[in-house]
Amino acid sequence: MSVSYSAMKSAKWNGRILLNGEPAFVDTLVRAGDTVSFDPAENRPVYTPVPFPLALNIPWEDESLLIVDKPAPLASQSSAAHPDDSLENAVYAYLGCPPGFVYRPVNRLDRGTSGLMIIAKDGHTQDLLQRMLHTEDFRREYLALTEGIPFPREGLIDRPIAKENAASVRREIRPDGQPAQTEYRVVDVRGGRALVRLRLRTGRTHQIRVHLASLGCPVCGDFLYGTELPEEFPGRFALHSAFLTQVHPHTQEKIQLESIPSWSR
């Protein structure tokens, strides 16, 4: 059975791993004669992948990993809003529409964010990579163009993030939010804008966007936390997953990739 990392995580936290018919912890001791059952059902709609023909920029691939330079605007995953035009469906088409296809992104980028995304080709590889997130063996850095110059020009933003409310997609800085830390460094100043290099220590939704906006320097073109700039950044904003240093989970090879967006030059 092929099971996604998110399905396993959901089953773990929602009591859908059973030992002899009773909810069990993942570290529960199993004895001969015990029956273990697992319900992978997730509390979200299931979308059947459809081929989406898109010329993908793929800087790295082997039998277990696929690294894609995602364009923007493009949804990372299919949804009710984007059932066809998604990276998920583009990868499905690129791989030849294999039967039983399971999409296993290790990191996700917002629709308006471009850059390097890592996709595992099997569940074991995905699990290994998820365990490496935010360690020196899996280092990802971003470039952002901001409205305004962050002060100080280098530092750590350590501010908890929470959903604005149950119905909103916006996030906000709030004391009762999830811990969130972002390292940043201004690498260039261009009039009233700054080119900023960032590294996530945690992985909250919209983390970079919310943290930069909290400094009074939203990402250029960010319609949620700043000002939309449709002529300069149509359908997207100036945020890009630009640098990746990755230890291959199977071969231990060190993979180093760069993707520099045109607006940062």
Where are these regions (language model features)?
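RNA pseudouridine synthases
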Residues: M1-L156, P160-N165, V189, W263
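Short glycine- and Lys/Arg-enriched binding-loop motifs that mark or flank ligand-binding interfaces
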Residues: I17, D69, R111, L116, ...
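Pseudouridine synthases involved in rRNA/tRNA modification
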Residues: M1-A11, L56, P175-Q181, D188-L195, ...
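Short aromatic-glycine motifs in intrinsically disordered, low-complexity regions
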Residues: A167-D176
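Extracellular/lumenal ectodomain signal focusing on beta-strand-rich modules
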Residues: R16, R108, E183, S241-F243
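Generic recognition of long tandem-repeat/solenoid scaffolds
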Residues: V68, I157, R171, A194-V196
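Conserved beta-strand segments that form the floor/walls of ligand-binding pockets within enzyme
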Residues: L18, R104, L145, R185, ...
